Protein backbone atom coordinates (compact mmCIF):
# COMPACT_ATOMS: atom_id res chain seq x y z
CA UNK A 1 0.00 0.00 0.00
CA UNK A 2 1.31 3.45 -0.92
CA UNK A 3 0.19 6.23 1.41
CA UNK A 4 -0.24 9.75 0.13
CA UNK A 5 2.12 12.14 1.97
CA UNK A 6 -0.83 14.39 2.72
CA UNK A 7 -2.67 11.62 4.54
CA UNK A 8 -2.06 10.80 8.16
CA UNK A 9 -3.29 7.26 8.71
CA UNK A 10 -4.55 6.04 12.05
CA UNK A 11 -4.23 2.49 13.33
CA UNK A 12 -8.00 2.06 13.23
CA UNK A 13 -8.07 2.98 9.52
CA UNK A 14 -5.05 1.05 8.25
CA UNK A 15 -3.99 -2.40 9.52
CA UNK A 16 -0.43 -2.07 8.24
CA UNK A 17 1.55 -0.11 5.68
CA UNK A 18 3.86 -1.89 3.27
CA UNK A 19 6.29 0.63 1.83
CA UNK A 20 6.62 0.15 -1.91
CA UNK A 21 10.02 -1.09 -3.04
CA UNK A 22 11.14 -2.13 0.44
CA UNK A 23 10.87 -5.12 2.74
CA UNK A 24 9.63 -2.94 5.58
CA UNK A 25 6.11 -2.93 6.97
CA UNK A 26 4.97 -0.15 9.28
CA UNK A 27 2.86 -1.91 11.90
CA UNK A 28 0.08 -0.26 13.92
CA UNK A 29 -0.58 -0.73 17.64
CA UNK A 30 2.55 -2.78 18.32
CA UNK A 31 3.43 -3.88 21.85
CA UNK A 32 6.82 -2.51 22.87
CA UNK A 33 7.28 -4.72 25.94
CA UNK A 34 8.95 -7.46 23.90
CA UNK A 35 11.42 -4.93 22.50
CA UNK A 36 12.67 -3.67 25.88
CA UNK A 37 14.94 -5.42 28.35
CA UNK A 38 12.50 -4.58 31.18
CA UNK A 39 9.73 -6.46 29.33
CA UNK A 40 7.27 -3.69 30.20
CA UNK A 41 5.59 -0.88 28.29
CA UNK A 42 2.51 -0.21 26.22
CA UNK A 43 2.01 -0.04 22.47
CA UNK A 44 3.55 2.07 19.75
CA UNK A 45 1.00 3.86 17.61
CA UNK A 46 3.20 2.86 14.67
CA UNK A 47 6.32 0.67 14.64
CA UNK A 48 8.94 0.01 11.96
CA UNK A 49 12.18 -1.97 11.99
CA UNK A 50 13.98 -1.52 8.65
CA UNK A 51 16.66 -4.04 7.72
CA UNK A 52 18.90 -1.83 5.57
CA UNK A 53 19.84 1.81 5.11
CA UNK A 54 17.68 2.17 2.00
CA UNK A 55 14.61 0.95 3.87
CA UNK A 56 15.43 3.29 6.75
CA UNK A 57 15.41 6.22 4.32
CA UNK A 58 12.08 5.02 2.92
CA UNK A 59 10.53 4.92 6.39
CA UNK A 60 11.75 8.46 7.10
CA UNK A 61 10.40 9.61 3.73
CA UNK A 62 7.01 8.26 4.78
CA UNK A 63 7.39 9.88 8.19
CA UNK A 64 8.01 13.31 6.65
CA UNK A 65 4.50 13.25 5.20
CA UNK A 66 2.83 12.54 8.52
CA UNK A 67 2.02 14.67 11.53
CA UNK A 68 3.65 12.26 13.97
CA UNK A 69 6.22 12.34 16.77
CA UNK A 70 9.26 10.11 16.24
CA UNK A 71 11.03 7.88 18.76
CA UNK A 72 14.21 5.89 18.09
CA UNK A 73 14.64 2.45 19.64
CA UNK A 74 17.69 0.18 19.75
CA UNK A 75 17.87 -2.89 21.96
CA UNK A 76 15.45 -1.31 24.44
CA UNK A 77 17.97 -1.32 27.28
CA UNK A 78 18.50 1.71 29.54
CA UNK A 79 14.87 2.53 28.75
CA UNK A 80 11.51 2.59 30.52
CA UNK A 81 8.42 2.96 28.32
CA UNK A 82 5.15 3.83 30.01
CA UNK A 83 2.19 1.47 30.15
CA UNK A 84 0.27 3.96 28.00
CA UNK A 85 2.72 3.39 25.17
CA UNK A 86 4.04 5.95 22.72
CA UNK A 87 2.25 8.12 20.20
CA UNK A 88 3.61 8.42 16.69
CA UNK A 89 6.27 6.30 15.01
CA UNK A 90 8.73 4.14 16.92
CA UNK A 91 11.67 3.41 14.64
CA UNK A 92 13.86 0.47 15.64
CA UNK A 93 17.44 -0.09 14.49
CA UNK A 94 17.58 -3.67 15.81
CA UNK A 95 18.02 -5.19 12.33
CA UNK A 96 20.65 -2.74 11.05
CA UNK A 97 23.66 -5.03 11.47
CA UNK A 98 27.05 -5.04 9.79
CA UNK A 99 30.68 -4.91 10.91
CA UNK A 100 33.73 -3.94 8.86
CA UNK A 101 37.28 -4.37 10.16
CA UNK A 102 40.23 -2.40 8.77
CA UNK A 103 43.12 -4.64 9.76
CA UNK A 104 45.82 -2.15 8.75
CA UNK A 105 44.53 0.82 10.76
CA UNK A 106 42.82 -0.99 13.61
CA UNK A 107 39.46 0.54 12.73
CA UNK A 108 36.09 -1.13 13.05
CA UNK A 109 32.94 0.41 11.57
CA UNK A 110 29.74 -1.06 12.95
CA UNK A 111 26.06 -0.57 12.08
CA UNK A 112 23.88 0.91 14.82
CA UNK A 113 21.85 -2.23 15.47
CA UNK A 114 24.80 -4.49 16.26
CA UNK A 115 24.95 -5.50 19.94
CA UNK A 116 27.93 -3.70 21.48
CA UNK A 117 28.77 -6.88 23.41
CA UNK A 118 29.08 -8.83 20.15
CA UNK A 119 31.48 -6.21 18.79
CA UNK A 120 33.56 -6.53 21.95
CA UNK A 121 33.86 -10.27 21.40
CA UNK A 122 34.71 -9.85 17.71
CA UNK A 123 37.53 -7.46 18.60
CA UNK A 124 38.82 -9.73 21.37
CA UNK A 125 38.99 -12.74 19.04
CA UNK A 126 41.27 -10.69 16.77
CA UNK A 127 43.50 -9.65 19.64
CA UNK A 128 42.36 -6.01 19.36
CA UNK A 129 42.37 -4.03 22.59
CA UNK A 130 39.82 -1.37 23.52
CA UNK A 131 36.34 -2.89 23.83
CA UNK A 132 36.87 -5.50 26.52
CA UNK A 133 34.52 -3.52 28.77
CA UNK A 134 31.61 -3.98 26.36
CA UNK A 135 30.93 -7.67 26.96
CA UNK A 136 27.75 -8.14 28.95
CA UNK A 137 26.39 -4.71 27.99
CA UNK A 138 22.83 -5.35 26.74
CA UNK A 139 22.56 -2.41 24.31
CA UNK A 140 23.36 -1.74 20.67
CA UNK A 141 26.23 0.23 19.18
CA UNK A 142 23.84 3.11 18.47
CA UNK A 143 22.67 3.19 22.06
CA UNK A 144 26.24 2.99 23.34
CA UNK A 145 27.14 6.08 21.32
CA UNK A 146 24.08 8.05 22.42
CA UNK A 147 24.61 7.43 26.15
CA UNK A 148 28.39 6.97 26.15
CA UNK A 149 27.97 3.51 27.62
CA UNK A 150 30.79 2.10 29.67
CA UNK A 151 31.98 -0.28 32.36
CA UNK A 152 35.16 -1.18 34.24
CA UNK A 153 36.27 2.48 34.21
CA UNK A 154 36.16 2.64 30.41
CA UNK A 155 33.57 4.06 28.03
CA UNK A 156 32.54 4.43 24.40
CA UNK A 157 34.12 7.87 24.01
CA UNK A 158 37.63 6.53 24.62
CA UNK A 159 37.81 4.60 21.34
CA UNK A 160 35.09 6.17 19.17
CA UNK A 161 36.43 8.11 16.18
CA UNK A 162 33.19 9.22 14.55
CA UNK A 163 29.54 8.33 14.06
CA UNK A 164 27.32 8.64 11.02
CA UNK A 165 23.90 10.00 11.95
CA UNK A 166 20.72 10.50 9.98
CA UNK A 167 18.45 13.51 10.27
CA UNK A 168 14.65 13.10 10.19
CA UNK A 169 14.74 14.31 6.55
CA UNK A 170 16.97 11.35 5.63
CA UNK A 171 20.16 13.36 5.25
CA UNK A 172 23.41 11.96 6.64
CA UNK A 173 26.05 13.68 8.77
CA UNK A 174 29.37 12.44 10.11
CA UNK A 175 30.04 13.66 13.65
CA UNK A 176 33.50 13.47 15.18
CA UNK A 177 34.17 12.41 18.75
CA UNK A 178 34.51 16.08 19.70
CA UNK A 179 31.24 17.06 18.00
CA UNK A 180 29.42 14.31 19.88
CA UNK A 181 30.29 16.11 23.11
CA UNK A 182 30.73 13.07 25.31
CA UNK A 183 30.62 13.24 29.08
CA UNK A 184 29.69 10.75 31.80
CA UNK A 185 26.88 8.55 30.42
CA UNK A 186 25.68 11.14 27.93
CA UNK A 187 26.43 12.88 24.64
CA UNK A 188 25.09 15.68 22.48
CA UNK A 189 22.78 13.11 20.91
CA UNK A 190 20.76 13.24 24.13
CA UNK A 191 20.75 17.03 24.06
CA UNK A 192 20.57 19.42 21.11
CA UNK A 193 21.17 16.68 18.54
CA UNK A 194 18.38 14.49 19.90
CA UNK A 195 16.60 14.26 16.54
CA UNK A 196 19.56 12.43 14.97
CA UNK A 197 19.63 8.66 14.56
CA UNK A 198 22.96 6.86 14.77
CA UNK A 199 23.47 4.81 11.60
CA UNK A 200 26.97 3.51 12.26
CA UNK A 201 30.04 4.17 14.39
CA UNK A 202 33.78 3.82 13.83
CA UNK A 203 36.10 2.78 16.65
CA UNK A 204 39.90 2.96 16.77
CA UNK A 205 41.27 -0.07 18.58
CA UNK A 206 44.78 -1.37 19.25
CA UNK A 207 45.70 -4.51 17.31
CA UNK A 208 48.78 -6.59 17.97
CA UNK A 209 47.85 -8.42 21.15
CA UNK A 210 47.35 -12.16 21.23
CA UNK A 211 43.85 -13.58 21.13
CA UNK A 212 44.50 -15.21 24.52
CA UNK A 213 45.47 -11.90 26.18
CA UNK A 214 42.38 -9.96 25.11
CA UNK A 215 39.97 -12.90 25.39
CA UNK A 216 41.23 -13.51 28.92
CA UNK A 217 40.52 -9.94 29.99
CA UNK A 218 37.17 -9.96 28.21
CA UNK A 219 36.11 -13.21 29.87
CA UNK A 220 37.08 -11.91 33.31
CA UNK A 221 35.00 -8.77 32.75
CA UNK A 222 31.98 -10.85 31.76
CA UNK A 223 32.38 -13.13 34.78
CA UNK A 224 32.51 -10.12 37.08
CA UNK A 225 29.33 -8.65 35.60
CA UNK A 226 27.46 -11.95 35.83
CA UNK A 227 28.53 -12.49 39.44
CA UNK A 228 27.53 -9.01 40.61
CA UNK A 229 24.51 -8.11 38.47
CA UNK A 230 21.02 -9.65 38.10
CA UNK A 231 21.39 -11.25 34.68
CA UNK A 232 18.59 -13.71 35.40
CA UNK A 233 15.79 -11.11 35.67
CA UNK A 234 14.52 -8.44 33.27
CA UNK A 235 16.19 -5.09 33.97
CA UNK A 236 17.45 -2.01 32.15
CA UNK A 237 20.99 -1.94 33.50
CA UNK A 238 22.11 0.67 36.01
CA UNK A 239 19.19 2.85 37.08
CA UNK A 240 21.10 5.86 38.45
CA UNK A 241 24.27 7.66 37.42
CA UNK A 242 26.96 7.58 40.07
CA UNK A 243 27.28 10.88 41.99
CA UNK A 244 31.09 10.93 41.63
CA UNK A 245 33.10 10.13 43.69
CA UNK A 246 30.32 8.16 45.42
CA UNK A 247 28.46 5.12 44.12
CA UNK A 248 24.67 4.99 43.82
CA UNK A 249 24.56 1.28 44.67
CA UNK A 250 26.40 1.84 47.95
CA UNK A 251 24.09 4.67 49.02
CA UNK A 252 21.01 2.61 48.21
CA UNK A 253 22.35 -0.48 49.96
CA UNK A 254 23.30 1.47 53.09
CA UNK A 255 19.65 2.49 53.41
CA UNK A 256 18.59 -1.17 53.44
CA UNK A 257 16.65 -0.86 50.19
CA UNK A 258 17.85 -4.08 48.59
CA UNK A 259 14.76 -6.22 48.08
CA UNK A 260 12.37 -3.25 48.49
CA UNK A 261 9.41 -3.87 46.23
CA UNK A 262 6.57 -1.96 44.62
CA UNK A 263 4.15 -4.13 42.66
CA UNK A 264 6.19 -6.46 40.48
CA UNK A 265 9.34 -4.31 40.58
CA UNK A 266 12.12 -4.84 43.12
CA UNK A 267 15.47 -3.29 44.00
CA UNK A 268 17.81 -6.12 43.09
CA UNK A 269 19.18 -8.08 46.02
CA UNK A 270 22.35 -8.70 44.01
CA UNK A 271 23.13 -5.10 42.99
CA UNK A 272 21.31 -2.14 44.56
CA UNK A 273 21.58 0.09 41.47
CA UNK A 274 19.43 -2.34 39.50
CA UNK A 275 15.65 -2.57 39.59
CA UNK A 276 14.33 -5.89 38.32
CA UNK A 277 11.00 -7.04 36.95
CA UNK A 278 10.41 -9.86 39.39
CA UNK A 279 6.70 -10.58 38.93
CA UNK A 280 4.98 -9.20 35.82
CA UNK A 281 5.74 -5.62 36.78
CA UNK A 282 4.09 -2.66 35.14
CA UNK A 283 6.19 0.23 33.91
CA UNK A 284 4.46 2.34 36.56
CA UNK A 285 5.77 -0.03 39.27
CA UNK A 286 9.32 0.53 38.07
CA UNK A 287 8.76 4.28 37.82
CA UNK A 288 7.35 4.46 41.35
CA UNK A 289 10.24 2.44 42.73
CA UNK A 290 12.82 4.65 40.99
CA UNK A 291 11.36 7.75 42.59
CA UNK A 292 10.96 6.10 45.98
CA UNK A 293 14.66 5.20 46.01
CA UNK A 294 15.58 8.65 44.74
CA UNK A 295 13.54 10.26 47.51
CA UNK A 296 15.04 8.10 50.26
CA UNK A 297 18.60 8.85 49.18
CA UNK A 298 17.91 12.57 48.99
CA UNK A 299 16.21 12.56 52.40
CA UNK A 300 19.05 10.77 54.18
CA UNK A 301 22.12 12.02 52.28
CA UNK A 302 21.01 15.25 50.61
CA UNK A 303 22.03 13.78 47.25
CA UNK A 304 19.59 13.73 44.35
CA UNK A 305 20.43 10.68 42.25
CA UNK A 306 20.10 11.32 38.53
CA UNK A 307 18.38 8.51 36.61
CA UNK A 308 20.51 6.89 33.92
CA UNK A 309 17.47 5.12 32.52
CA UNK A 310 15.54 7.13 29.94
CA UNK A 311 11.80 7.35 30.58
CA UNK A 312 9.43 7.66 27.63
CA UNK A 313 5.70 8.30 27.69
CA UNK A 314 3.34 9.37 30.45
CA UNK A 315 3.69 8.26 34.06
CA UNK A 316 1.59 9.13 37.12
CA UNK A 317 3.36 11.02 39.89
Swiss-Prot record:
This is UDP-N-acetylenolpyruvoylglucosamine reductase. The keyword Cell cycle applies. Keywords: Cell cycle, Cell division, Cell shape, Cell wall biogenesis/degradation, Cytoplasm, FAD, Flavoprotein, NADP, Oxidoreductase, Peptidoglycan synthesis. The active site is at residues 185, 238, 308. Residues 39-208 form the FAD-binding PCMH-type domain. Its main location: cytoplasm. It comes from the Bacteria. Its EC number is 1.3.1.98. GO terms for cellular component: cytosol. GO terms for molecular function: FAD binding; flavin adenine dinucleotide binding; UDP-N-acetylmuramate dehydrogenase activity. Cell wall formation. Belongs to the MurB family.
Amino acid sequence: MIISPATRPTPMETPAIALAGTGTIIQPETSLAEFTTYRVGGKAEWYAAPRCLEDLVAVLDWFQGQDLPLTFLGAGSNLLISDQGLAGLVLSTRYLRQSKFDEEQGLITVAAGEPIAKVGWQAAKRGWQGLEWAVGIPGTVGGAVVMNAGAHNQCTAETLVEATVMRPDGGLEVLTNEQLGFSYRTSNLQKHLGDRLVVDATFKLTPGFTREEIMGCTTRNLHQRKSTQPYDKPNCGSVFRNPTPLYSARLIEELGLKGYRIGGAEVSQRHANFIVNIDNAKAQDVFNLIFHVQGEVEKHYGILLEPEVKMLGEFAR
